[in-house]
Regions:
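Beta-propeller domains with acidic blade repeats across secreted/periplasmic ectodomains
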Residues: 1-169
Length: 169
């Protein structure tokens, strides 16, 4: 879950606590949720890897993002790891990118560009740094079939690092 603490009087002790988001799988898993950061626009940015599965509100209801989609990995349309942006209160929730494996620590630069790393599943032979172009599918699994990089497919590359991200499908 994502817990939001507020210090109203500046004494470095929380005066209130709110469960902003719940239902996220992968607790204590390196493919689960990662740190929340503020962007220069004052919004929260965070991500989870492919163990995150879904995100729900404080009451346990599925989050519906600004595109009108339920935020989960059931391929309708999202799958695998995702990166998000929302207001401090959780409103205006956006799914900025999806179909990552183990995307790690989203970062937002002073221009508002979003960056993160994503790594493979066979000894780091396919690690990549992503510029997160908003609303993109980043290809860890095949978009139409959901197949992984080990599955036979048209134009399969000979080298493992080139297979991971379906760049030649």
């Amino acid at each position: 879950r994502v817990v939001f603490f507020t210090d109203k009087d500046g004494d470095d002790k929380p005066d209130s606590k709110k469960n902003l988001f719940t239902g996220i799988s992968g607790t204590q898993h390196d493919h689960g949720i990662h740190a929340v950061h503020f962007g220069p626009d004052g919004k929260f940015y965070f991500n989870f890897g492919n163990a995150g599965r879904q995100i729900k509100d404080e009451a346990g209801k599925p989050i519906i993002d600004l595109a009108g989609n339920e935020v989960n990995d059931k391929r309708k349309p999202y799958q695998q790891g995702m990166v998000f942006r929302c207001n401090e209160d959780g409103s205006d929730f956006e799914t900025l990118g999806w179909n990552f494996r183990n995307n790690w620590e989203v970062a937002v630069d002073s221009f508002g560009s979003v960056w993160q790393s994503d790594n493979d599943d066979d000894g780091n032979r396919g690690v990549r740094i992503n510029y997160v172009m908003e609303y993109g599918n980043y290809g860890y699994r095949g978009e139409f079939t959901g197949k992984g990089w080990r599955d036979k497919r048209t134009n399969i590359e000979k080298e493992v690092p080139l297979r991971h991200w379906h760049l030649n499908d």
